[in-house]
């Protein structure tokens, strides 16, 4: 079983830990807990670069090895890193589980060494009609991020 982890942090008081587990070539299970967010939906994506030298801004675009448009996790046309939204409760905390087949932990399209970014606003899943809908889901600013690392 492959395992990875990312510790999310920000200058805005958002923090959390996200775990990834993959059995063989099967889907990857993502489990996490993030706190310090405003209640509601927040875009949650794997970004292309594991570079936080300029905070979350240097993590690049959504991870997109297949050159597709932005979409929902269940869509055929989507970035590999499009994991949709996490739901934050009134206490500012999100606890979630996502199962996804486009974010392997090994092989040529591995997400290890890339970044996870939590956004300020909901991801419209490419359906919002905004000029950014088909690239970012119009999910707003980047409020927390971290680099995905292998876990023993």
From Swiss-Prot:
- State its location(s): Cytoplasm
EC number assigned by the record: 1.15.1.1
Originating gene: SODCC
> What's in the GO CC field?
cytoplasm
Which terms in the Gene Ontology molecular function aspect does this entry carry?
copper ion binding; superoxide dismutase activity
Native organism: Spinacia oleracea
**Record's protein name:** Superoxide dismutase [Cu-Zn]
Lineage of source species: Eukaryota, Viridiplantae, Streptophyta, Embryophyta, Tracheophyta
Q: Coiled-coil segments, which residues?
A: none
According to its UniProt entry, the function of this protein is described as: Destroys radicals which are normally produced within the cells and which are toxic to biological systems.
């Amino acid at each position: 079983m492959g395992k990875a982890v990312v510790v999310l942090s920000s200058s805005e008081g958002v923090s959390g830990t996200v775990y990834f587990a993959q059995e063989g070539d099967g889907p990857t299970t993502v489990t996490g807990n993030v706190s310090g967010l405003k209640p509601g939906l927040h875009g949650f994506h794997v970004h292309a670069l594991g570079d936080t030298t300029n905070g979350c801004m240097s993590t690049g675009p959504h991870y997109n090895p297949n050159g597709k448009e932005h979409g929902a996790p269940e869509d055929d046309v989507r970035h590999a890193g499009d994991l949709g939204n996490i739901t934050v409760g009134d206490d500012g905390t999100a606890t979630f589980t996502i199962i996804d087949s486009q974010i392997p932990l090994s092989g040529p399209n591995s997400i290890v060494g890339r970044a996870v970014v939590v956004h300020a606003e909901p991801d419209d899943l490419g359906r919002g009609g905004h000029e950014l809908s088909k690239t970012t889901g119009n999910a707003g600013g980047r409020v927390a991020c971290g680099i995905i690392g292998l876990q023993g």
